[in-house]
UniProtKB/Swiss-Prot annotation:
This is Large ribosomal subunit protein uL5. GO terms for cellular component: ribonucleoprotein complex; ribosome. Belongs to the universal ribosomal protein uL5 family. Part of the 50S ribosomal subunit; part of the 5S rRNA/L5/L18/L25 subcomplex. Contacts the 5S rRNA and the P site tRNA. Forms a bridge to the 30S subunit in the 70S ribosome.
Length: 179
């Protein structure tokens, strides 16, 4: 079993139950899924850029991403409806815990001038969104093979009802929030 999953069952669940006075173990919030999304703006003129982004996302997540397409045409961006403009991957279960563990213990500390992630990025429903400016912070990405530095959005979806519960859950998992 994954290190974080074990920690969740043995340490985090009892801690959250006592802190928020839950009656049942099923009320304890847990991480439902992690969605990694990257937009490739230059895919409009250069289709090779999207292939590179998909390849990098596959290495980072360990799972093949799905290509996202434009919902509507925007003339200013030379964009037609249905054109491929990004990629996203949804992680659940074992892979989700592996990725989260890697993100918290390896990738985030590699960010330049890292002082912790913002406490304000919760959406009011207990989900946390994190923006990463470059894909080089992940250990799987080889610096020499990167054609262009790309950012990505990482959304951590929890079953928590409030932001306070979600923040406590992620803090227990080791998410480095700003002081």
């Amino acid at each position: 079993m994954n290190r974080l999953k074990e920690k969740f069952q043995k340490e985090i669940t009892p801690a959250l139950m006592s802190k928020f006075n839950y009656k049942s173990v099923m009320q304890v919030p847990k991480i439902e899924k992690i969605v990694i999304n990257t937009g490739v703006g230059d895919a409009v003129s250069n289709s090779k850029a999207l292939d590179n982004a998909v390849e990098e996302l596959t290495q980072i997540a360990g799972q093949k991403p799905v290509v996202t397409r434009a919902k509507k045409s925007i003339a200013g961006f030379r964009l037609r409806e249905g054109m491929p403009i990004g990629a996203k991957v949804t992680l659940r279960g074992e892979q989700m815990y592996e990725f989260f563990d890697k993100l918290v213990s390896v990738s985030l500390p590699r960010v330049r001038d890292f002082r912790g992630v913002s406490k304000k990025s919760f959406d009011g429903r207990g989900n946390y969104t994190l923006g990463v400016k470059e894909q080089l912070i992940f250990p799987e990405i080889d610096y020499d093979k990167v054609s262009k530095v790309r950012g990505m959005d990482i959304v951590i979806v929890t079953t928590a009802n409030t932001d306070e519960e979600a923040r406590e859950l992620l803090t227990q998992f080791g998410m480095p929030f700003q002081k």
